[in-house]
Amino acid sequence: MAGGCAYAALWPGSQLFGATLIAPARPGELALTFDDGPNPAWTPRLLEILAREDVHASFFLVGSKAETETSLVRQIAEAGHLIGNHSWSHRNLALAPARLIDEELRRTTETLEQIIGAPVRTFRPPFGARRPAVLRIARRLGLVPVLWNAMTSDWKIPSAEAIAERLARTIDRLQWRGRAANIVLHDGSHAEPAADRAPSVAAAEKLIARYKQSRRFVRVDAWG
């Protein structure tokens, strides 16, 4: 029983605790998503790459960081990228009481909407951790819970080539299975504000170069 609960709470593909948006049966589509920003050290470089390649992505932002980087948040939105809620403090919401879950999500949504002047309708739980209350509160606040199906530990892999190759293997496997790829990379860090995200940013550039001619890059809100 304990193992089943842990699977439901942490495995991104699990739907046991409630439906989440992962990726549809559209093998020609890829969604680049970035967590734990905004990060003034690395997000601007990422935005330059995306603009040059004419690719739109999805950014799941930590509210407490967004509050101090309002111009960067606006820059992300004005470039046509999706802004999503990644909680206020990046805590494990599966272990939090309902009152705190509501506060973390509500405060982040209100802050982001005030900054960009547009609705925020997607939410990615920190660590992918959730329980029924997390998903229920998110939906009550008008947020679609979004998980993923392509991730590697980019935050601890020092090589952009290794990150890109590991993700490419997953992407190709998903295409063979007839699925789109919902890819997670990190332009920030919840634990180390000064963490080097150069490998993750470079890996995103490599993935775009590899798949731009054969796949379509979309924002996750294209899927629901």
Regions found by a protein language model. Give the residues of each.
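Active-site beta->alpha N-cap acidic-glycine motif
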Residues: 9-96, 100, 104, 109-116
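Charged helix-capping and loop-helix junction motifs
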Residues: 74, 101-105, 160-167, 197-204
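C-terminal domain-boundary segment and adjacent tail
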Residues: 14-26, 52-54, 67, 194-224
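His/Asp/Glu-enriched short active-site or ligand-binding loop at hydrolase and phosphoryl-transfer sites
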Residues: 129, 135-176, 215-224
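A cross-domain feature marking catalytic cores of carbohydrate-active enzymes
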Residues: 34, 61-63, 85-87, 125-127, ...
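Hydrophobic alpha-helical topogenic segments used for membrane insertion/localization
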Residues: 1-10
